[in-house]
């Protein structure tokens, strides 16, 4: 029984570390989203003719981003850009735009 205590403590530390790792730094997400400004405008407020992202549903934006990434949605550049992010990063970006005021 005594030898299981250090093992249990090590497992608990690993689990806690994984949970902390899952959190994304808000400044990092903002930095990722800044890459979208050329086409979608500052903070997702686009000029006419381009889709605005500010205030859009996180779920809908994420769905589109994942479709671009998988090549299921036609695009000029989005299919290339979205492949540079993990699904978790795309989810964080979609949430960031959802939180912006239109």
Predicted regions and their residues:
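Residue-level marker of structural boundaries
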Residues: 38, 70, 99-102
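Residue-level hotspots at or immediately adjacent to binding/recognition sites across diverse folds
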Residues: 23, 42, 81, 96-98
């Amino acid at each position: 029984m005594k030898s299981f205590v250090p093992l249990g403590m090590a497992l608990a530390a690993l689990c806690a570390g994984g949970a902390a790792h899952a959190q994304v730094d808000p400044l990092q997400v903002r930095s990722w989203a800044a890459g979208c400004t050329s086409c979608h405008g500052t903070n997702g407020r686009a000029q006419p003719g381009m889709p605005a992202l500010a205030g859009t549903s996180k779920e809908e934006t994420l769905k589109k981003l994942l479709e671009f990434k998988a090549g299921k949605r036609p695009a000029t550049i989005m299919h290339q850009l979205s492949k540079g992010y993990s699904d978790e990063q795309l989810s964080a970006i979609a949430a960031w735009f959802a939180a912006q005021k239109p």
